[in-house]
Regions:
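C-terminal all-alpha effector/ligand-binding and dimerization domain
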Residues: 2, 17, 180-244
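A generic short alpha-helical patch detector that favors 3-5-residue windows
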Residues: 17, 21, 93, 97, ...
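Helix-loop "lid/cap" segments that line or gate small-molecule binding pockets
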Residues: 102-114, 155-162, 210
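Conserved amphipathic alpha-helical segments that form helical-bundle/coiled-coil interaction surfaces
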Residues: 116-185, 203-206, 218-229
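A ubiquitous short alpha-helical element
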Residues: 88-92, 110-116, 137-141, 187-196
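Short linear motifs at protein or domain termini
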Residues: 1-111, 165, 236-244
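Alpha-helix N-cap/N′ positions at the starts of helices
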Residues: 78, 101, 124, 199-202
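General structural signal for alpha-helix termini and helix-helix connectors
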Residues: 35, 107, 111, 131-139, ...
Length: 244
């Protein structure tokens, strides 16, 4: 983030000022795939994509490898990568499975109760989310910061569940298209993008409220609803072939 972004930040809460190098390339490419910029099977040219995004070829190549792990692109041997063909049913099924698994994690944590250390970690994590939305608009770097915050929240929840099998099952499921909690299908309109991400943050707050109240059913239900919210983006399904 540049100097101007740091000086505009409100002192409380502190705004995120570090993002992973090249992460914005992954997010941008994921959005292009979700919006149907590449037809299924179409080769994604590294040079053309790098020029479109205003970066060198290396971060594009790194991003494509990451998106291959997410099931969004497939390797074409020495020819690079192509957008993977997928159906709405495939995406819905993968997201539903994630909701079930993360819902189980939330339920287990609500049943056991948070330790003081766990509660502190979740408080610190949610504070990162609050900082992102404090100004009511998304500034440069905020989408990247949300990506990190969102991934941290989901990882904390699954780890705190105390069941390693949940994490293993989620890791396997994450190789399916748009199944990962990190596979954000973002809006191109800034106002819609803010609303979409802010809604996801409020879901996190709701889940944690249920966990702190030891309400197992509500915690599980809230986490499932949160996962299915990804299906609400029309752009996510614009390029998908309907499953009849």
């Amino acid at each position: 983030m540049d100097t101007a972004d740091r000086t505009e930040a409100k002192p409380a809460p502190k705004r995120p000022d570090r993002v992973k190098p090249g992460q914005h390339v992954i997010i941008s490419l994921r959005r292009m795939i979700a919006q149907g910029r590449f037809a299924p099977g179409e080769r994604i040219g590294e040079i053309a994509t790098a020029e479109t995004l205003g970066v060198s070829r290396m971060p594009v190549r790194t991003a494509l490898r990451a998106l291959e792990a997410e099931g969004l692109v497939e390797k074409l041997g020495a020819r690079g990568y192509a957008a993977r063909s997928m159906t709405s049913a495939e995406v819905e099924g993968a997201i539903e499975v994630r909701g079930v698994l993360e819902g189980l994690a939330a339920r287990r944590l609500a049943a056991r109760g948070l330790s003081a250390a766990e509660d502190m970690r979740f408080c610190e994590c949610l504070a990162r989310g609050e900082a992102i939305f404090a100004r009511g608009t998304l500034a440069q770097g905020d989408v990247d910061a949300f990506h990190d915050y969102n991934r941290a929240f989901h990882a904390l929840l699954v780890a705190a569940s105390g069941n390693p099998s949940i994490a293993e099952a989620i890791a396997r499921n994450d190789h399916l298209p748009f199944a990962s909690s990190s596979a954000l299908a973002l809006e191109s309109d800034p106002a819609s993008e803010f609303a979409h991400l802010h809604s996801a943050h409020r879901d996190h707050v709701d889940v944690m409220d249920a966990i702190r109240r030891r309400d197992e059913e509500r915690a599980e239900r809230a986490m499932r609803v949160h996962a299915r919210a990804a299906l609400g983006s029309e752009r996510l399904f614009r390029r998908l072939v309907p499953q009849g």
